[in-house]
């Protein structure tokens, strides 16, 4: 099983992904799409930096999928953390077509997302966060959607456990 968690900045993808992997799975790998893309050092482009950024993001998706395939072949469940936009869901679906896979959009309100962003170390501007939020709001290619504005990390992790292990 491969679960791709997408959502805006500060939606809780990392926290939820790690909680789910630790609490709900016997063997699980967490692949952070940001960490994969940061392997590209010169030049490194953020998603809002134009056409080159989409090329780099597609390359990051392909490498995240290579890692996912390797972990699945060793018997691990996989959680991929990424911001899926443009045609990236199609790239994930094509690259992982032979596996059971779900794209789950975690979508808090803009206000909750911004509040969470301001209560953690600085990473991106409010304008950049808004760009990411709007791309996630417009995203149509996902399998499941959850509004975690008022849900705890444990609640969302339990929900993921139910859809992946109890009602696959």
What are these regions (language model features)?
Residues 5:
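Hydrophobic anchor at the beta1->P-loop junction of P-loop NTPases
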Residues 11:
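ATP-binding Walker
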Residues 14:
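Walker A/P-loop
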Residues 55-98:
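Glycine-rich phosphate-binding loop used to anchor ATP phosphates in small-molecule kinases
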Residues 119-159, 166-168:
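Small-molecule kinase domains that catalyze NTP-dependent phosphoryl transfer to phosphate-bearing small molecules
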Residues 8:
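P-loop (Walker A) phosphate-binding loop of NTP-binding proteins
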Residues 18-63:
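Conserved substrate/cofactor phosphate-moiety recognition/catalytic segment
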Residues 82, 97-117, 146:
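Conserved phosphate-donor/acceptor-positioning beta-strand/loop module used by diverse small-molecule
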């Amino acid at each position: 099983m491969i679960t791709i968690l997408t959502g805006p900045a500060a939606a809780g993808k990392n926290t939820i992904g790690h909680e789910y992997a630790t609490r709900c799975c016997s063997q699980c790998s967490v692949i952070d799409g940001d960490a994969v893309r940061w392997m590209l050092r010169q030049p490194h482009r953020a998603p809002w930096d134009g056409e080159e950024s989409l090329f780099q993001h597609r390359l990051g998706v392909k490498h995240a999928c290579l890692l996912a395939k390797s972990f699945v072949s060793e018997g691990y469940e996989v959680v991929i953390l990424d911001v899926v936009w443009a045609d990236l869901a199609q790239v994930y679906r094509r690259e992982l077509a032979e596996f059971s896979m779900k794209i789950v959009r975690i979508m808090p309100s803009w206000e909750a997302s911004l509040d969470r962003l301001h209560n953690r170390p600085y990473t991106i501007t409010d304008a950049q966060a808004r760009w990411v939020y709007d791309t996630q709001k417009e995203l149509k290619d996902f399998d499941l959607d959850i509004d975690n504005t008022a849900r705890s990390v444990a609640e969302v992790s339990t929900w993921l456990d139910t859809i992946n292990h109890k009602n696959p």
